[in-house]
Amino acid sequence: VGGLENNEIFLKNVRQAMETGEPGFSFNFGAKQNETLRNACTEVTSEDDSDVCNLGSANLGNIRSLDEFRSVVHLGSKFLVCGTLRADLPYEKVYKVREKNRRLGLGLMGIHEWLLQRQLPYEVNEELTKWLEIYENESEKAANEHCDRFYISRPVAYRAIAPTGSIGILAGYVVACSVQ
């Protein structure tokens, strides 16, 4: 295990962040150690200050069938809902805004790889459209049913553009190829 100096992935990401600004790390020390709350990401925007979003990504490059994809989206959406119940937050106001909005951001990554596996051009096509319909419908259905089960507010948002630089780089997938 060891310290951060032994973590190759972390060091690779830090080097790239220093060179390009991606992935979007937030280091809160030194002059920034007293920062209260910041949102370095812009995948999901909100009119509410103090809003939070629980982000995650489904990796299309590793999914082989529509049934498997439906299951991944279903479980991923439920997982993100549970994250809104368990995450510790820094301020009471953030808890209140989270309860009001329960903002989720299930993204898709590996779209480029998915297209290459199927020898499809990088454009919207009939097969991709079917997958995106499942993504839209199942993410909302699963999240709403799970929220209703716990008698909590339904999310105001379900999906986000992904992968972010951070998630894509960590997973070793192409970043900034998002079809939404």
Task: Indicate residue ranges for each PLM-predicted region.
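Function-dense linear segments that define catalytic or interfacial modules
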Residues: 16-118
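Short acidic-glycine loop/turn motifs at beta-strand connectors
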Residues: 29-33, 62, 162-164, 171-175
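Conserved, charged catalytic cores of large soluble enzymes
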Residues: 1-31, 105-144
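Coil-to-beta-strand transition motifs
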Residues: 22, 164-167
